[in-house]
Amino acid sequence: MLQLSLFPENTIHSNKFPTTRYQGSKQRFVDWIWKCIKDIPFNSALDAFGGTGSVSFRLKEEGKEVTYNDILIFNHIIGKALIENTNTTLSDSEVKILLSKHRDTSYPDFIERTFKDIYYTDEENRWLDVVSTNIRNMGNPYKQAIAYFALFQSCIIKRPYNLFHRKNLYVRLQDVERSF
């Protein structure tokens, strides 16, 4: 996946890369990596094991042309949304359409059936089925990637400790005193 920079004046810039607790993420080291390579003369870079895209994103912010790669499809989607995409965004009306159930659309219940009582409540699983179907129905691949990325981030935030390594929905649903 190659970052296109045909129209740099339309490039989307952000000051902060979205964080996750993704095992193996280089986000914690990205400033150190940049410090080590910034004086090397180069215009392009290959991020062969792109993962969350934190290194590619930083290089893009520094004006470098980045080729991003990752074997996992959801990471490929993140790369398309944050690295390859230069000027596509979602409007408020598009977000509203994504978050709404539509009478003329048939929604599967795959997430609701498959992941019952594992990561999210039944209502949240139904909502995920609706939103993921609406994303698949979008025509623009960059808008799809942005929407999926936002959905991934919202799913991570909703999880205890931002992790998916075990069935622990009960941790979030317990009625206990919290210090945060």
Give residue ranges: language-model regions:
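Conserved S-adenosyl-L-methionine
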Residues: 49
